[in-house]
């Protein structure tokens, strides 16, 4: 009898949960800079769709899991901050707890709507337009540092000093593998949050 009781107990157990490695209280955050070359001035009719999405997408970022900080002026966005020696370039500079948190915001939230329409609003850039790098927790990156990290990718390619979501590097001293970009680009949820 005891063996059939044991079999019943085993049959009623839930299936084991698969757990992906997660970094524990890391001393590093991920900084990201993304630049875009505007097709027209921000007040032009052809950019109305982009401008109308700024506030809701920024609010979504601010409330997203893993979000830490973003560059913004008193207006609440960074469109008025000049960088990269071109008045048509706008800069997005932010800090996230993990690469995964950043990737999920970019590819699995309503932010994807901006990506889908980027060709309507921005010129194609020949050079690097995205750079990621690890920073100690509590550090806020500067626009000058962001320009430097993009220059690193342009001049030397991706490395642990500056990399992309497509070719990420783990945090310094970490033995936790960096999740594949495919995990963010093709999430299991069918609708952006």
Q: Where is each model-derived feature located?
A:
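A structural signal for the main folded, soluble domain(s) of proteins
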Residues: 86-95
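An amphipathic, aromatic/His-enriched active-site/gating alpha helix that lines ligand/cofactor pockets
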Residues: 86, 99-127
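Short S/T/G/P-rich N-terminal loop/turn motif that feeds into the first structured element of a domain
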Residues: 8-87, 104, 128-193
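Short coil/turn motifs at secondary-structure junctions
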Residues: 39, 97-99
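Generic anion/oxyanion-binding catalytic loop in active/binding sites
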Residues: 59, 91, 100
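Tryptophan-centric aromatic hotspots in well-structured domains and transmembrane helices
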Residues: 69, 95-96, 121-122
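Serine residues within intrinsically disordered or low-complexity segments
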Residues: 3-4
